[in-house]
C-alpha cells in the first residue's frame, strides 16, 4: 500500500488542468486532428499504461484486470491483451450491463477475446497469486458513488495485497472535484491520459491516486492550441514570480508590512506571521498587538517592530504600510472587532485570515483589494454551509467565495486552490500531511503578505506564497518526515524557495 503522507507526482506532469467534461466532449476532435479513430486513441492509452505498468512492476507475473462497462474498461481490455501477449498471466473481471458498450470499448473487448482472453464474472474470488491489479472499472464520467456491486469489487481490490495501477483515474474518485462519495480504489500508481483533471489534484486525491503519471497520447500539439481554464503550480513556477533582487534594493523598496492581531494568549500566531514575512523578504515588518506581547515578541524576533494596538497606532500604521495583514490571533471580541473596523475600508492591498474571516462571515462585504485565506471550516462559515459541502467540490466553493467576497481567495487544504475575481484559477501541487498542525496558516499569511509588499499582484502573491510554503514543507519532510512537523520549522527551508535562483534546491 502506498504511504500517502506525501504527495507523489512524476516529473513529467504538465501545468495545465482541464475539465473532465470538456475533455470527454473534445476527445473526438482531438483524435480527428491526428486522423485517428477513438479506438486507435484507446489503443494508445492501453499501450502507454501497459508500458508504464511493466516498467514500474517488472517482477510481476500475474495481473488482475478489472474492467467496467465503459471506455475506462476498454482501456483495461487493451492492457490485458498486451500483457497476455507479453507472457503475463492475466485474469480479467468485467462488469456486464444490459446497455451496449461504447463502440471503441466493444472493439477492445472483441480483440481481447480474439486473442484467447477469458472474461470472468466480478463475483469470483480474486486470485490470491495476482501481484498487480489494473483498475479500469470507472472513469472520468462518474459523478456519484459507485453502484453497490462495483463498490464491493473496489473494496475487494483494496483488501488484496497486490498494488493497484489506475487507468486515467482511480475508480470512485470524481474527476471534476476530487471527492470520494463512496468506495474508491486506493491506487499505488495512476496514469492519466491526454490532460490533467482537477480531481487528481485536490480533495481526497492524494489519499488514493498514489504516484501520478501522465501521457498525452500524442495530442500535445492539439492541447497546446486550447486555452486551459486551470493552472497547476509547483516549485518549478517560482522563478516566474520571484526574480533576483536588484543590487540597489533596500528595506524601503522591499516593502513595508503591518500585521495586526495577537489577542490574549495568541502571541505565537502573530509572531509566526511576522517572522514568516521577514523570511519571505519583506523589508520592514510592524506588528500591532496587545501590550503584554511586545517584550516576548521583540525578544524572540528582534527584527520585528512591535507596538501596542491602539486607535492612533492603527491609523499611523495604515498610512505607513504598503500592505496590511489582519487576523492571526485577532480574536472575535471587541478588541479584534474594533481593529478590523479600522482596517476594512483601507484601499491598500490586504490579507485577511483566521479570526478576521470569522468576523467577515458575520458581516460579509466585497473588496477588490483583499486576499482571504480560509481553511474549509472558515470557508463553510463564510458561505453559510457545511464543511462537507466545501470539500465535496472545492473548485465550486472557491468560485462562490470569490463571487461573494471579491478579490482573491486561497482555499487551503490538500490541493490548495487559488481563485481571483479575474477568473484566474490555480491548483497548488505541493505540500504534505505534516502541514496539518497549528500555525501553518499564520506562516502562510506572512509569506503572502510579504510577497504582496514586494509588489506582486494579489493572485501571483497568493500562488507564489502557497507554493513557497508547501515546497518548504516538502523539503523538510524529505529529511525528517511529516509527523511532528511544526509551523516554525519551515523557516529553516523557506529561504531556499523565496530565492529560487539559488542552485541548491533539490528538485527530486
Predicted regions and their residues:
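Small-residue (G/A/S/T)-rich helix-start motifs and N-terminal tracts that mark the onset
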Residues: 2-94, 102, 189, 200-352, ...
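Conserved acidic functional residues
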Residues: 27, 135, 166-168, 351-354
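N-terminal small/polar loop signature for handling phosphorylated ligands or for N-terminal nucleophile
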Residues: 78-159, 295-309, 315-316, 320
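Glycine-rich, charge-decorated loop segments at or immediately adjacent to ligand/cofactor-binding or catalytic sites
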Residues: 103, 171-185, 357-367
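Short, conserved catalytic or adaptor-binding loops enriched in Gly and charged residues
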Residues: 109-114, 183-184, 204-207, 401
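Internal gly/pro-rich beta-alpha loop/helix module
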Residues: 130-132, 137-228
Amino acid at each position: 500500500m502506498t504511504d500517502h503522507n506525501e504527495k507523489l507526482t512524476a516529473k513529467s506532469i504538465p501545468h495545465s488542468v482541464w475539465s473532465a467534461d470538456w475533455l470527454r466532449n473534445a476527445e473526438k476532435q482531438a483524435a480527428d486532428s491526428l486522423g485517428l479513430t477513438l479506438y486507435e486513441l484507446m489503443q494508445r492509452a492501453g499501450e502507454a499504461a501497459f508500458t508504464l505498468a511493466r516498467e514500474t512492476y517488472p517482477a510481476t507475473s500475474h495481473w488482475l484486470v478489472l474492467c467496467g462497462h465503459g471506455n475506462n474498461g476498454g482501456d483495461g481490455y487493451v492492457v490485458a491483451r498486451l500483457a497476455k501477449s507479453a507472457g503475463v498471466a492475466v485474469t480479467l473481471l468485467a462488469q456486464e450491463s444490459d446497455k451496449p458498450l461504447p463502440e471503441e470499448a466493444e472493439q477492445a473487448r472483441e480483440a481481447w477475446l480474439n486473442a484467447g482472453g477469458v472474461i470472468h464474472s466480478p463475483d469470483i474470488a480474486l486470485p490470491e497469486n495476482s501481484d498487480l491489479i489494473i483498475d479500469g472499472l470507472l472513469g472520468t464520467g462518474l459523478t456519484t458513488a459507485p453502484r453497490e456491486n462495483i463498490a464491493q469489487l473496489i473494496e475487494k481490490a483494496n483488501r488484496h495485497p497486490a498494488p493497484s495501477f489506475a487507468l486515467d483515474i482511480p475508480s470512485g474518485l470524481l474527476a471534476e472535484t476530487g471527492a470520494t462519495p463512496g468506495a474508491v480504489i486506493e491506487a499505488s500508481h495512476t496514469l492519466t491520459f491526454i490532460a490533467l483533471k482537477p480531481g487528481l489534484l485536490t480533495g481526497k486525491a492524494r489519499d488514493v491516486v498514489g504516484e501520478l503519471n501522465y501521457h498525452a497520447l500524442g495530442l500535445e500539439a492539439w492541447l497546446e492550441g486550447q486555452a486551459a481554464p486551470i493552472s497547476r503550480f509547483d516549485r518549478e513556477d517560482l522563478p516566474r514570480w520571484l526574480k533576483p533582487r536588484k543590487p540597489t534594493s533596500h528595506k524601503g523598496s522591499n516593502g513595508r508590512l503591518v500585521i495586526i492581531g495577537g489577542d490574549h494568549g495568541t502571541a505565537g500566531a502573530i509572531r509566526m506571521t511576522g517572522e514568516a514575512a521577514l523570511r519571505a523578504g519583506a523589508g520592514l515588518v510592524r506588528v500591532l498587538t496587545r501590550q503584554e506581547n511586545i517584550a516576548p515578541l521583540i525578544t524572540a524576533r528582534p527584527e520585528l517592530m512591535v507596538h501596542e494596538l491602539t486607535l492612533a497606532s492603527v491609523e499611523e500604521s495604515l498610512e505607513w504600510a504598503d500592505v496590511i495583514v489582519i487576523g492571526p490571533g485577532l480574536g472575535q471580541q471587541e478588541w479584534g472587532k474594533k481593529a478590523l473596523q479600522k482596517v476594512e475600508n483601507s484601499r491598500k492591498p490586504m490579507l485577511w485570515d483566521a479570526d478576521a474571516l470569522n468576523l467577515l462571515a458575520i458581516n460579509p462585504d466585497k473588496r477588490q483589494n483583499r486576499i482571504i485565506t480560509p481553511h474549509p471550516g472558515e470557508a463553510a462559515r463564510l458561505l453559510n454551509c457545511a464543511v462537507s459541502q466545501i470539500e465535496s467540490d472545492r473548485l465550486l466553493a472557491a468560485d462562490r467565495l470569490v463571487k461573494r467576497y471579491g478579490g482573491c481567495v486561497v482555499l487551503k487544504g490538500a490541493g490548495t486552490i487559488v481563485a481571483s475575481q479575474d477568473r484566474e484559477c490555480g491548483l497548488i501541487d505541493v505540500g504534505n500531511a505534516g502541514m496539518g498542525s497549528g500555525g501553518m496558516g499564520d506562516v502562510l499569511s506572512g509569506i503572502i503578505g510579504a510577497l504582496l509588499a514586494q509588489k506582486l499582484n494579489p493572485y501571483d502573491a497568493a500562488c507564489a506564497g502557497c507554493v513557497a510554503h508547501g515546497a518548504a514543507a516538502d523539503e523538510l519532510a524529505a529529511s525528517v518526515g511529516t509527523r511532528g512537523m511544526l509551523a516554525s520549522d519551515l523557516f529553516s527551508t523557506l529561504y531556499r524557495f523565496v530565492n529560487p535562483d539559488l542552485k541548491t534546491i533539490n528538485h527530486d
